[in-house]
Amino acid sequence: MTLDTAEKQKLIESHQVHATDTGSVEVQVAMLSERISKLSDHLQGNIHDYASRQGLLKMIGKRKRLLSYIKGKNPQNYQDLIKKIGIRG
């Protein structure tokens, strides 16, 4: 499941670090989280879509690696990001 341009722009604006930021780790995690959410909804109704399930697992793994990177570099940013996105309780 892809995000349209307006959704991407909204995510970038809400998570960017500076005015021209489009690829920081925070923005990447926010976009991945949104795509994971959309794909999870898709898989609720299409339980035999194994290719999408595989893509979902890859996205979850990538998000996990990016989050561990943030946690190592700046634990406060990590805490702020997971609260802002609403993952991990």
Curated annotation (Swiss-Prot):
Annotated InterPro entries: Ribosomal_uS15, Ribosomal_uS15_bac-type, uS15_NS1_RNA-bd_sf
Keyword field contains rRNA-binding: yes
Transmembrane segments: none
Gene Ontology molecular function: rRNA binding; structural constituent of ribosome
Gene3D superfamilies: 6.10.250.3130, S15/NS1, RNA-binding (1.10.287.10)
Entry keyword annotation includes RNA-binding: yes
Extent of the signal sequence: none
Entry's Gene Ontology BP terms: translation
Quaternary structure and interacting proteins, as annotated: Part of the 30S ribosomal subunit. Forms a bridge to the 50S subunit in the 70S ribosome, contacting the 23S rRNA.
Annotated NCBIfam families: S15_bact (TIGR00952)
Family indicated by similarity: Belongs to the universal ribosomal protein uS15 family.
Name assigned to this protein: Small ribosomal subunit protein uS15
Species: Prochlorococcus marinus subsp. pastoris (strain CCMP1986 / NIES-2087 / MED4)
Lineage: Bacteria, Bacillati, Cyanobacteriota, Cyanophyceae, Synechococcales
